[in-house]
């Protein structure tokens, strides 16, 4: 079983960092791909963050495990490997690792997840991290979540395999959730029911039902999913507005969390 440091040591070499070329402590967006792995749309969101003075960290969960896209499509996308609660271990390790950087404002973090990545984020927010071995980590409870000010959930996976989808969140940040009207993995009604639960815990949740398929913002996607350029641009704009809402002013130096 990994510790947070051990998990981050595996993940960090494969993290793509996008942001201003300085050492100022800036807000950070941690971005987690879907079950198909890294695709062309996440760098577009990272550039939106960079343009607003944020740092973006695109976390690859597959390269550290030695998994190809083909392998992940056959195992993760089918639910055989790396369920959401296991992916949540990557989410916590990334929060912990990024928060130790001197060029990150640890009081202003955003978690962004696409499909499977969104599932992992929701598991991280709702888990009883005091339970021994929670989320596949020996020390999951030691990660403070107070700095997580927002989440961006792009057509998060809330289907039948997400057994904990109705489990109340224990940390309830501001949330923008994109629901695909023609998502083959969930109904709009089911997705809205899950997000209504998050509102009940005190989270400010905005939902946008986009008239597209699952992964509508991902170029080169495969049927039944279909890329929609107009909706994709709308999604990027909404992501940018969320960043503005979270950190409308230039970032200032704040005390880092002690190691």
Where are these regions (language model features)?
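Glycine-rich His-Gly loop
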Residues: 31-36, 156, 180-181
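C-terminal catalytic histidine-bearing segment of alpha/beta-hydrolase fold enzymes
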Residues: 204-259
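Serine-hydrolase catalytic machinery in alpha/beta-hydrolase-like enzymes
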Residues: 4-19, 25-104, 119, 216-226, ...
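An N-terminal hydrophobic leader/cap segment in hydrolases
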Residues: 1-21, 111, 116-117, 122, ...
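Primarily recognizes the serine-hydrolase "nucleophile elbow" in alpha/beta-hydrolase
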Residues: 86-170
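Short beta-strand/loop motif that positions the catalytic acidic residue
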Residues: 171, 177-179
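Acidic beta-to-alpha connecting loop that harbors the catalytic carboxylate
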Residues: 181-184, 212-213
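Conserved alpha/beta-hydrolase "acid-adjacent" motif
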Residues: 184-193
């Amino acid at each position: 079983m990994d510790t947070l440091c051990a998990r981050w040591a595996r993940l960090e070499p494969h993290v793509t960092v996008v942001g201003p070329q300085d050492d100022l402590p800036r807000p950070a967006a941690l971005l987690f791909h879907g079950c198909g792995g890294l695709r062309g749309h996440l760098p577009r969101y990272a550039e939106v963050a960079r343009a607003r003075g944020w740092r973006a960290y695109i976390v690859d969960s597959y390269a550290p495990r030695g998994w190809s896209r083909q392998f992940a499509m056959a195992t993760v996308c089918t639910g055989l490997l790396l369920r959401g609660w296991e992916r949540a271990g990557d989410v916590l390790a990334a929060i912990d690792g990024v928060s130790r950087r001197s060029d990150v404002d640890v009081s202003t973090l955003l978690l962004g997840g696409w499909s499977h990545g969104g599932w992992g984020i929701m598991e991280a927010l709702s888990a009883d991290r005091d339970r021994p071995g929670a989320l596949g980590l020996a020390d999951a409870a030691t990660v403070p979540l107070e700095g997580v000010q927002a989440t961006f959930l792009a057509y998060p996976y809330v289907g039948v395999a997400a057994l904990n989808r109705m489990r109340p969140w224990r940390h309830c940040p501001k949330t923008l959730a994109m629901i695909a009207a023609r998502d083959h993995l969930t109904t709009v009604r089911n997705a809205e029911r899950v997000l209504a639960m998050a509102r009940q815990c005190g989270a400010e949740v905005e939902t946008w039902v986009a008239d597209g398929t699952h992964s509508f913002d991902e170029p080169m996607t495969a049927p039944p999913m279909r890329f929609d350029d107009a909706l994709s641009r709308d999604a990027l704009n909404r992501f940018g507005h969320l960043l503005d809402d979270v950190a409308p002013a230039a970032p200032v130096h704040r005390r880092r969390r002690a190691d």
